[in-house]
Amino acid sequence: MLLANPIAPDNLLSGSGALVVLAIVLFAECGLLIGFFLPGDTLLFAAGISIATGTITSPLAAYLVVAPIAAVAGNLVGYWIGYTAGPVVFHRPNSRLFRPEYVTRAHEFFERFGSWTIIIGRFVPIVRTVVTVMAGVGRMRFALYTLYSVVGAVLWADGVLLLGHQLGKIQFVRDHKNWIDYLVIVVVILGFVPVAVHYWQGRRR
């Protein structure tokens, strides 16, 4: 009897494990300062395609519920970090993962869009991590912050999932399911490359 290939797409992307991994990545990217370069967009898009092609066997509804919840949970943790320790974090010297230019970029968003930054920034990597902490530092009203976080999480997480799901319904994609599955895995792996590169550059300094 042949052993199953652990790196085959059907094994990597099927079952509840994929949903757990996605939830962890979204939580970290949306709330923890170490989550700057985690490929949340890529994973959401890949999950949508994989659900449509049948590689992921969990129902789409489960992802549409869990993904926004994970993102909002991350936001609330990020707000708490900013509220309790933000000034200390933002005034630290350059570290391998956190740099002043990230704060500057997020601050520019706040200057331009105000509270709407919580929603708009959700679609911008790095910004979606920093603005949550900055909202806590700025003592943004918690109820308003939570409302914007929920709206932004649903629009972003479910929007990208559904976009990938619709693409996965295209006949060409379904006819080349095996190749698409491998392509999805390659794209997801490439999404983690910036993390490794950034960490390596930090170690060289």
Q: What is each residue range found by the language model?
A:
Residues 28, 32, 57-68, 154-155, ...:
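Hydrophobic alpha-helical transmembrane segments of multi-pass inner membrane proteins, especially
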Residues 158-170:
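Transmembrane alpha-helical segments of integral membrane proteins
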Residues 1-24, 49-144, 169-187, 194-205:
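Membrane-interfacial helix-loop-helix
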Residues 29, 155, 189-192, 196:
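Hydrophobic membrane-targeting signal helices
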Residues 23-42:
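Transmembrane alpha-helix interface/packing and boundary motifs in multi-pass membrane proteins
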Residues 43, 73, 151-159:
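Membrane-embedded alpha-helical segments of transport systems
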